[in-house]
Structure formats: C-alpha cells, structure tokens
Amino acid sequence: EMSASLVGSEMCIRDRMSPEPKERNTLSTYRMTFAYIGSFVALLLFMPMVNYFKQGHSEQYGWMMGVVIIAVMCAALFYGCFAWTRERVKPIREKQSPLKEDLKDLLHNKPWWILLGAGIAALIFNSIRDGATVYYFKYFVVEEEYSVISFFGVSFVLSGIYLAVGQAANIIGVILAAPVSNRIGKKATYMGAMMIATVLSIIFYWFDKGDIALIFAFQILISICAGSIFPLLWSMYADCADYSELKTGNRATGLVFSSSSMSQKFGWAIGTAVTGWLLAYFGFQANVVQSEETIHGIKMFLSFLPAIGTILSVLFISMYPLSEKKMKVITTELELSLIHISE
C-alpha cells in the first residue's frame, strides 16, 4: 500500500493534461480500463507463473518469483507512464504553497467533501459484496457440488469465476462511462448507475441457491454499474481541483487526489470490518453447516447491505454542485486569469 501511494501521482496528472471535462472523462476511462485489465491479467497469470517457477524449487520460491515478475512489469509501466505524458495546463500561481495552506483550502472545498462521502459509500458497497462472496458460494450455493473449471492451468471454483466475471464486467462499465457521461453528464450517469445497482442488489436477495445463471447475470449487471462510477469520480476530483484554484488561487492537485485515494482505502477498510462484525453477529462459524439465521445474514451481504452503500452514495452525489455548465464557466475564468497574468 505504501509503494502504491508513492506512485499514485499518475492519478493527479489528468487535470494537468487537459482542462476539458469531456477529455478528462476519456482519460479517466482509459486509466480505469487498463487498471482493471491489469488486475484481470494478474489474476489469470499469477498462479501459472508460480507453478512454473516452483519446478525444481520450493513453492515459496515460485511465489517470490511470481511477485518479482509482476513488480518488474509494474516498474516498467510506471516509467513509461511518466516518460510519455505531458502537463499542458498551467496553474494560475506557479509558486508552491505551504502544506498548511493546502489543507485549509481542501477543508473548505465543499464539492470535495461531497465526493469524499460518495466515494467511501461506493467502496463500502464494493468491499461488502466482494468480501462476502466466498461465504455466499461456500455455505449458501454450496459450490462443492459443482465442477471445478481449469483455465491456464489454474483451477477455479464458482466463487473465483464469479469474481473474475465481475472484474471483466467492471471493464465494460468503465468503457461505457465516458460516452454516457458526455451525453447526459457525470452526475446523472453516476446517480443512474448507483440507483440501478441498488434495485439489482435488492432483487439479489431472493435468488435460490440453484439460480446460478441469474446470480451470474446480476453480477455482470451490478459490476457494470460499479465499474462505471470510478472514472467519473476521478474526473470529478479533477473538477474539484479547478474549483479550488478559482476560489483560492491554489490548485493543490496532489493533495486533492492523494486525500481522495486515502478516503477510498478508508471506505474499503470500513466495508471489510463491517463484514467481519456482521458475520459474528449472525452467528457464523467456519467449516460447519450454517443456521438459517446465518444463511439469511450471508444473503444480506450480497443484497440489502451493499444497497445501503449505493443509496448513501446517491444521496451524497445528488448534492454535487459542479455540473458541466458550471465547469465551463470555471474553465473560462481560469483561462482568462492566465491570460491576465501573462500580460
């Protein structure tokens, strides 16, 4: 996590590459698409690499070499990112402001607070669904009754396939985010996706353990909705940086994005903790036949509980004030300020 935070500046550069909101949507879409593709590729290739390198060695060596290969690939891609991107948007004030002043400006940035709440709620939604998947398939669906599927020499049970399908559907959602938001706006797209995810999540509760086709179909639809919101969030964070620069003269792009990234990790941590607490509350005990109350609780993890997260996210984003029309005004005023300074 610490190394990921150190290289997280690639998230901050998008608002410096273009001042146009639609172009930022496209940049965010590319970024999130390849992020999900990278995760999907790593999921498929990691175990085959472990199996290859452990031949003639220990399994520990195989895992270590798998991590080394992934790390080298990541380093090369990060260097490529920074070598082949350019900052084209000039700030109003070239002089770097003190961190204390940046923090003060951030705390007075109302749109950022709204996105903070929406992002945390969205991550709670995601983390609860993903965190409970193994329990849902092991104790409710009883995946042991189904055949194991092998792919690239790796055996996948139903829960693994379910998560992989969700990851692939996330990519579809990311790709759809830019064209849809460019047509109806980021706020409307975000709210629409989360409201659809809410309805689908609630319906999910009533599936029987034999409704495998429906379970996977709804996973695809919900994951498309979930995937579409994150490029929109990052694009809106860039708008928050513009808003802050216009109001204070201080852009503080790095702080806006790094604090937002931290808040999303916070949301994931909350969702994971809630999953553990509620499993204990519903009387869960590992590797035994679960009671009816516990099964009810496990079903809640993939239905009503994540729906609470989506509803909270919709409530937050409904208050977001930076519409496309408002951003055009902000962008124009920033450009006029730069012209005035240059004269």
Language-model features and meaning:
Residues 111-132:
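Pair of pore-lining "gating" transmembrane helices in MFS-fold secondary transporters
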Residues 173-186:
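Helix-to-loop junctions at the C-terminal end of transmembrane segments
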Residues 89-116:
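Juxtamembrane intracellular "pre-TM" segments in multi-pass secondary transporters
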Residues 28-47, 260-275:
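Glycine-rich segments within core transmembrane alpha-helices of 12-TM secondary carriers
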Residues 5, 9, 214-230, 236:
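Hydrophobic core of transmembrane alpha-helices in multi-pass small-molecule transporters
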Residues 1-8, 13, 339-343:
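Single conserved hydrophobic/aromatic residue that forms the stacking wall/gate
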Residues 196-210:
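C-terminal ends and interior cores of transmembrane alpha-helices
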Residues 132-157:
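Short amphipathic helix-loop junctions that connect adjacent transmembrane helices
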